[in-house]
């Protein structure tokens, strides 16, 4: 038994340290699985207390899953030790979750790193009384379909619980084919069949349609890319959740999902979704909506102590956008004018009023 398991067992007060964690069933593996943003202290160190507070906020808001680490900056710019410590803290916190499945990101630069993180995550999960899942994307350094496929096949032999596959990393790394994803789900039925379709635009819709046709071998297809097409993909294609780094809007995202599940009986789903789209589309405000100005909200909520980010020293522009390169970073603060803060605050208060009205109906 590893040291991580012993320490976690002590933290959770488990009498039987070797007990196997509950594995979430397919019903739990649907809905908004939001990616937690990584918070930082003034010196650039990871603020693990804030990370736990953020995860608890997502759970209390009604999200069905909390994923960490999963976004590019958290995968590339955190040290292995920082990722392990964050996961330890989150597994302890997840014991008191009432809604969310803790989903541990195990993505690595290569297959060996991915498998090492997965083994560590399984060691932690084996001590958790709460259901735990995993999430992975193709290894950053993979350049051929064969390399991507080999990684997921190897991971399928290590994982003992559901793994959400994110299909896209960068233009340099090929996305796994739909045929391969379906075959994986058939060969590893307790592990695969949960897909975050990360392709963009019309290609995402085409792939999702293929994946959903493969049900019940494929269990859940999640919308992605911030939820830009979530409403269409739910109504026209049948996606059953969202995976995205939009933690500040968790109460609204959870409300949208509940309304989707209920079949939109009052015809108000489109209004709720329009509110969400407006919140994430403040393009004139610095930083973008993925992390950027959302940090202002996370700090205002009392979850984060700073609005600092580790930012790539190098980046590259591709057809799919601008992507960070390497593992070197600088510490950058979010800088907003008073007018920008006022606009963001007005938008957030609008969301709160909307949710209060919906709750009173």
Kindly give the residue locations of the regions a language model identified.
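General structural feature for long, well-ordered alpha-helical segments within catalytic domains
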Residues: 47-50, 54, 82, 86, ...
